[in-house]
Amino acid sequence: MATSTIQQSAFAGQTLLKPQNELVRKVGGNGGRVSMRRTIKSAPESIWYGPDRPKYLGPFSEQTPSYLTGEFPGDYGWDTAGLSADPETFAKNRELEVIHCRWAMLGALGCVFPELLAKNGVKFGEAVWFKAGSQIFQEGGLDYLGNPNLVHAQSILAIWACQVVLMGAVEGYRVGGGPLGEGLDQLYPGGAFDPLGLAEDPEAF
């Protein structure tokens, strides 16, 4: 009886361990990479979404327009100019704001990066971003990367032309579809740059 119980226990232990051993075997064959997914609450369940979300004046807010349903981030029920009344206009404005935020994040990186380079031996006329503009009034002026052979910042027209050409080319490339082809969301195309696999789960993304 004891022997039978021990054998059954051992068999049960092997059964319980089998999935784990199978997982270990598969992980070992895939270089130790495990794809894990978890369920994340959707945005409408948050207090910041839906009809009961906080309003811009709290309890003193006026009647919220019917087209502001709390579906999108930042919707506090305020649209006196009616900019979100037309769905197509709202979609276009939302696209522009997302792009503006991305340019702003890139600009924030551009504020910090020159200081990091300056601390590691790269010479700038002025690496601190809020002081760099004053260099335009100095005798030597302001050059990109401190190199006079590059675009000279004394010429406002040259700066303007560079901004229009460089940023306009990138934006035109994005609006035209870029390398991703058609049928993808222009704001969140996914797949182009996702080394951490953060967009693999549509619900989590």
UniProtKB/Swiss-Prot annotation:
MF (Gene Ontology): chlorophyll binding; metal ion binding
PANTHER family named in the record: CHLOROPHYLL A/B BINDING PROTEIN (PTHR21649)
Organelle targeting peptide span: 1-36
Binding-site residues for chlorophyll b 3, renumbered to this chain: 155, 171
Key word Signal present: no
CC cofactor note: Binds at least 14 chlorophylls (8 Chl-a and 6 Chl-b) and carotenoids such as lutein and neoxanthin.
Signal peptide interval: none
Species name: Silene latifolia subsp. alba (White campion)
Modification note: Photoregulated by reversible phosphorylation of its threonine residues.
Listed name of the protein: Chlorophyll a-b binding protein, chloroplastic
Any single GO BP term: photosynthesis, light harvesting
Binding site for chlorophyll b 2: 102, 151, 180
